[in-house]
């Protein structure tokens, strides 16, 4: 699945040997999340093994965003969600457990949680607001 300018470098990295690819471009691919939080939950991954979102090239970031838009259209027609969360964890303190950057596109549905206000702020539930 490599393309010019892209490389799947690390044989020990699960995200460097993808399965169930939904769509791809020269620099990134999208696939279902293995630990789906809701119907249609997808991750978008650069093909180059890079740990940090901020270490991705401008071209890789653009390729990832292009696929986010593409899979959003597909999720919308297939699952009809009421909203979305987009997330990326950078560093262990932020919850990154796989050191190959990937963005989550998580479809949200009315009633999937009792009170969705705050969105991803729920990650830091109980922390005082500044």
Predicted regions and their residues:
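HIT superfamily nucleotide-processing domains
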Residues: 1-130
């Amino acid at each position: 699945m490599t393309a010019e300018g892209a490389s799947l470098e690390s044989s020990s990295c699960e995200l460097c040997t993808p399965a169930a690819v939904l769509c791809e471009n020269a620099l990134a691919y999208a696939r279902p999340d293995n630990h789906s939080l809701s119907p249609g939950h997808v991750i978008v991954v650069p093909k180059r093994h890079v740990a940090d979102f901020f270490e991705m090239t401008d071209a890789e970031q653009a390729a990832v965003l292009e696929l986010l838009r593409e899979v959003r259209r597909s999720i919308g027609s297939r699952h009809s969600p009421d909203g979305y969360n987009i997330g990326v964890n950078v560093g262990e303190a932020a919850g990154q457990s796989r050191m190959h950057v990937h963005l989550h596109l998580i479809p949200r549905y009315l009633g999937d949680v009792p009170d969705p206000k705050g969105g991803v702020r729920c990650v830091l539930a109980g922390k005082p607001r500044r």
